[in-house]
Amino acid sequence: MSPATESFRMWAEDEKVYGPVDISTLVQWIQDDRVLPETFVQPQSDPCWRRAEDIETLREKFPVAAQVAAAEVGRGASSVAEALHEFPFFAGLTNEGLEQIAALGKAYEVAPGDLIVQQGDACDAVYFVLSGKLRVRLIIGAVDRIDKTLCKLARGEFFGELGMFLQSKRTADVIAETQSRLFRMNTNAFQLLVKQIPELASPVLFNIGATMARRVAEDNQRLYQEVTSQFVWG
């Protein structure tokens, strides 16, 4: 299908689908800032939802900086899909399904010491560690500011899923301990997955539920051990 006859649908910030519309209408939406580089768009000829900046016929409509960034993301999409095989969230998905998941998020690098999320921030995304090591810390006391390490996260681990579901605040800081590569899926992308791609969302939601249940059980066991260790039995 030629670009002139292609039609598109758009996933907007209000979590509604608009379209299909032709390329000229979509370009007008871009000029009006209704469609941004990170807005999800689905061409009629492609079953996958992608960022507008990742669609070749639309990329040139954005500023040069967005075009360069999109090209870098595109080159790394296959490696992201391969890395997502390691995460229990996506167990059972096909290669095609993982590639579609990869198109809904964004991979990026962080340097040692970089602050990824901060305590008190809104939980607007889930993060997956593709490589490197992160530290989860809690700053205790407004004056003393004691830096307490809660846990460390390495390749194949993730964080932020519970807060995203509850729409709560971050309860701790997460900082990069080494050079690391992360994959970030924000709330808007996750809602698109749930509402528009149910065949992928169903196994992902099941795996999320299983992961949360396991973590609750592990936390309960740790709490039980901490409480019982305080007693000396005769």
Per-range role (PLM):
Residues M1-L104, E109-P112:
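Protein-protein interaction regions
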Residues S7, K133, Q179-R181:
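Structural motif
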Residues P20, G92, V126-F128, K152, ...:
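Short aromatic/basic micro-patch
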Residues R51, T57-E60, T149-L205:
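Cyclic-nucleotide recognition modules
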Residues V68-E82, G97, R170-T171, N188-T228:
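A small-molecule sensor/coupling module
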Residues G113, D124-G141, R155-G156:
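Glycine- and acidic-residue-biased ligand/ion/polar-headgroup-sensing regions
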Residues I116-D121:
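Short phosphate-coordinating micro-motif centered on Lys-Gly-acidic
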Residues G141-D147:
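Short, solvent-exposed loop/turn segments that connect beta-strands within catalytic domains
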